């Protein structure tokens, strides 16, 4: 994990014994990605593929649900998606890279959160690794694999 100023960056890889196209079905779906994140209370996926996350952060300076407008910036099916999310308290960039392996698919997730209020960076520094655990568990559950 790297912390620079109010920015936190986490990268994690894991392998799953499922073909890349099936993993892509989950990773490319903005709703499935949002539902795996614990601070996302609800979300709306729009017709253009963008999504609005409504997040609650348990930090003193944020006393309300925050809207985060997300959109995919780059998609290379079935191997890579990069999305960005913007709000008044933080910006987030998520990258998901899928690599075929002999046993299935290697999934590399990178998240960068840039907080613009005190406490946002500390919250994600403590919790971003766990959010990647949640994403992995949601993916494994979605493709019904015993990992």
Give residue ranges: language-model regions.
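Beta-strand elements of well-folded, non-transmembrane domains
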Residues: 16-18, 55-59, 74-76, 87-89, ...
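Glycine-rich portal/gate segments that line the openings of hydrophobic small-molecule binding cavities
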Residues: 44-87, 142-146
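Beta-strand/loop substructures that line and gate deep hydrophobic ligand-binding cavities in soluble
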Residues: 84-137
């Amino acid at each position: 994990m790297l912390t620079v100023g109010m920015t936190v960056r986490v990268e994690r890889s894991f392998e799953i014994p499922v073909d890349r196209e099936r993993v892509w079905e989950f990773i490319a779906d903005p709703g499935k990605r949002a539902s795996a994140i614990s601070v996302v209370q609800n979300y709306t996926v729009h017709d253009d593929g963008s999504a609005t996350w409504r997040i609650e952060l348990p930090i003193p300076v944020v006393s309300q649900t925050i809207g985060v407008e997300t959109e995919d910036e780059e998609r290379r099916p079935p191997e890579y998606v990069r999305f960005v999310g913007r709000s008044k308290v933080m910006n987030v960039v998520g990258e998901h890279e899928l690599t075929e392996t002999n046993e299935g698919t290697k999934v590399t997730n990178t998240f960068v959160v840039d907080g613009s209020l005190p406490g946002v960076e500390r919250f994600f520094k403590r919790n971003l690794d766990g959010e990647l655990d949640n994403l992995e568990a949601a993916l494994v559950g979605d493709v019904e694999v015993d990992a």
